[in-house]
Structures are given as C-alpha cells and as structure tokens.
Design a protein with these regions (language model features):
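Compositionally biased, low-complexity flexible segments
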Residues: 1-9
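N-terminal low-structure segments adjacent to metalloprotease catalytic domains
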Residues: 8-106
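Generic alpha-helical secondary structure signal
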Residues: 60, 64-67, 71, 136, ...
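Auxiliary, metal-adjacent structural segments of Zn-dependent hydrolase domains
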Residues: 69-168
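Short, structured patches in soluble enzyme cores that scaffold and shape functional sites
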Residues: 167-169, 188, 192, 201
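Short pre-active-site segment immediately N-terminal to the catalytic Zn-binding motif
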Residues: 171-188
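Catalytic Zn2+-binding segment of zinc metalloproteases
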Residues: 193-208
Length: 210
C-alpha cells in the first residue's frame, strides 16, 4: 500500500491490466505480420546449399527407407510412451532442402502471428519495403537451417500436421558419422515420430503454439 497517497498500488496495477485486456487480441502488430513470407520462402529456396552428390539409386533408396521407417516407428513410440492417437499412421513427406523451406515458412508465419488479421491498425507507409527486407532476412535464416535439419514434425502443417524428413541431410550426416544408413534412418524417424505422437495425442498443443 502507498501510505503517502493513501491507495493500494496492487489495485492500480490490476486496473491497468484489466484496461489493457479490453483491447482486441489482434489490435497490436505482430512479428509475423511484419514479414513478407512469400519473399522469405522464395529467398530461402534460392539460397539453399547444394545437396551432397548421390546416384539416382541412392536417392530412391533413402526416400523409400525413410518412408517405411516413419511408418514402422509409430507403433513402438505409442507403446513406450503410452500416448495413443486416433486413425491410421500418416505418411511422412520426404523432401529435399528447397522443398523444406515452404512449409517451414508457413509454420513460422503461423507461430509468429502472421496469419492474424490486421485489426485495423494504420499501415506504415514503408511497410511493403520493410516487409520484403524482413522476408529476405528470414529466408536467409531458413536456408541456413535447411542444410542441417534432419526432420521436423510440423503440427500446423495441413489439417492434421505433417512429418517432414529432409533426405539430403540424412545422407550427409550418416556419411559424416560413418554409421549404418538403415539404423540411422530409423533413429531419425523414431525421434521425429515421437514429436508427432506427442502432438496428435494432445491436440491442444498445436492450438497453443498457434
């Protein structure tokens, strides 16, 4: 209590918070709305590093093995974790580095409020320019990440989420570590499928992230 003013400071803070909460949730600008996400996806795809050289046979083999491993990993993950999701095991999407960029940009856009409505706030006269600059910077970050990420479960992708496996990076890491390819690919899938099971068994998690 503020004895000099004869009032309770706690009440003042509560009243201030209550007043702020009356504002519409989308009335303030969000980070996501300051980025041109089309530019981010385009720049990111253009800047991706070349994939490790592989024969067409190896490329087809790793895609087939990752696809099969992503399905095989689901039952043991459900059994060990005790988490169960309704419906059949969904197929993973096996992608290269540029193909990973677009869904990653969409996911980042959703998580940063880029899908929120503008709420009527006045647009800055240079918003289009700054949005493209921010988009180019974001695209550069995505291109950097695209050369190292092995897989990702995106709970905001599509209607039911999507599991992405970046096969050039899987090849690069298994060569670097000199591990058995089949075992390493299964390990990657076990890790990423665990995230998928976490989200599909608890739908509120995706809603919380968005």
């Amino acid at each position: 209590r503020d004895r000099r003013a004869g009032r309770d400071l706690t009440d003042v803070r509560v009243r201030g918070m209550t007043k702020l909460s009356e504002n519409p949730p989308n009335s303030a600008p969000t980070l996501g709305r300051s980025v041109d996400w089309d530019v981010a996806a385009s720049v990111g795809a253009r800047l991706t590093r070349p994939a490790p050289p592989v024969t067409e046979y190896t490329r087809a083999q790793v895609i087939d093995e990752l696809s099969a491993a992503s399905r095989a990993a689901e039952p043991p993950v459900r059994e060990v974790t005790g988490l169960h999701a309704e419906g059949p095991v969904p197929d993973a999407r096996i992608v290269d580095r540029p193909q990973w960029i677009a869904p990653a940009a969409l996911s980042m856009r959703a998580m940063t409020g880029g899908d929120a409505e503008a709420g009527g706030e006045p647009q800055h006269p240079f918003a289009a320019v700054t949005g493209k600059v921010a988009g180019a910077q974001t695209g550069a970050v995505l291109s950097f990440v695209s050369s190292g990420i092995l897989g990702q479960y995106d709970p905001l992708g599509g209607d039911d989420g999507i599991l992405l496996l970046v096969y050039p990076n899987v090849i690069a890491v298994e060569r670097q570590l000199r591990v058995t390819p089949r075992d390493f690919r299964l390990w990657v899938c076990l890790h990423e499928v665990t995230h998928r099971v976490q989200f599909t068994a608890n739908p509120w998690l995706a809603q919380h992230m968005s």
